[in-house]
């Protein structure tokens, strides 16, 4: 039976006429006032700052006092909305499974790619990888204000203090090694400019691309050659997808529309924008109480029912954006395409490609979804790296360490390797600082962080090479699906996830990195980059070059498949490939793990125990909830699948961690 809904925060906010920051801070375990000392101070309550704090509190409960400082008065808008099974697995380790998460977020069932032919308008190829059966795993499309609010409340329930409306004063802050030597200056709020000083052993830079502390140690590094710019907006989410001009299109995928200059992301997700923060806090708290009580999925209120219960705004939207190379040559005058740069470049590419025009005719622009001036967004020169990610008394996590591109969503999903590993290391850092003289402590901490520094130093170039590999392959409709996507999933599919626990999660994440550090993957990636980059972007790749790269990739693939020590049902996971990862033109069969609600149009996981739409509450029939396995499972496969998702050996965290440093050809 579900708990009784409570309106604690709504009533508290009304009684005290509390601001957003005040009502959020009132939920801290030690209250709203900043502490005099804290083992760890985290700068930034974005997704990685909160993942760090939650992971540290769960890894060794009650061992560290953690204070998270966030300048915004409430969780606010950020781009980065698509997650992978690794993110869901981490959420599940923290007590929140799919039944509860899907009341707040959208379902994601794998990734689909459409490769547009620039020279033959209207023609395309595709690649599709499904997700996983709902009884085992899930993936989510998340609106960031909601994910950050969920993690804020969950962190507070785990003993972490999260202070909104407070800002680290980096000019006055003193960070030094050797134990408890940090003096973190924090503003008290809008109407009190006198900073409060917090004594701490460790400062964590979780300020994302702004790199507020990292930037003091070294300027950001830009990679040679072309970079990428992104421009995007928010659109309606059509219930009827039948008019979309791509075969077998489904809104439950993260859809990628790829072309020689870049690609478009298409992400269908729910938005709670416009809701009062106190009301949202009441709803999230209720969801967490339901999770604690183990309320079955079909006994939970749907998202629409929750919105009515707690007086919230709720709608489905579509995030659509371009991530395009910055060496593209645009017309000198773009005024015919709109009034702002983001709008102009967005519409320029829509009109350049016939299929993009047809596609966008199914969507209507939502103006100012996240407040005035938020109809169009643009971000330039996306890729960078922080040369220094730790030092005496501090370390960096997430995008503060570097970022490459939204393609394959590494920012959240791969970035979790830094935030969770740093969380585990922090316990040892603080222990060393308390148990040894300052100089000896700092020497030990420096040695402890060498592997972390080396990992971050190799991680971002590996992701940059991965990004460039995919981009250059998008220049041909054969290389996109048969080389880039094939290798991304063969090397990077998330194996062993069912065996990961809170102690081994970081080690798993460090080794995964979307397959970008797998030697065979790097071999194919470097070959493609070396060859394709010799051809100007506005020219078509020669057929002889494409044939050579296909043959090279297939040789490496065949050897890797033969040597692979585990079996996956590749013909069921990938739409156009057989079990040995051979491309099969015209093959459309695959497993089916989702269905679309006939009422609201939301995409739902197929599970025998879930007949209710998590979005609108409409009940389905038993046949509608059945998974289709194509090809059918053997008895052994069925037993293994429901036990562990795949037939791989158990994940062994004691395996030697090898971190090869990838090399990238000169631009």
Curated annotation (Swiss-Prot):
Name of the protein in question: Flavin-dependent halogenase malA
Result after altering residue 489 to H: Decreases malA catalytic activity
GO biological process: secondary metabolite biosynthetic process
Binding site residues for substrate: 494
Known role: Flavin-dependent halogenase; part of the gene cluster that mediates the biosynthesis of malbrancheamide, a dichlorinated fungal indole alkaloid that belongs to a family of natural products containing a characteristic bicyclo[2.2.2]diazaoctane core. The first step of malbrancheamide biosynthesis involves coupling of L-proline and L-tryptophan by malG, a bimodular NRPS, to produce L-Pro-L-Trp aldehyde through reductive offloading.
Organism expressing this protein natively: Malbranchea aurantiaca
Binding residues annotated for FAD, in chain numbering: 48, 70, 79, 82, 144, 168, 399, 412
Consequence the record notes for mutating residue 494 to A/Q: Abolishes malA catalytic activity
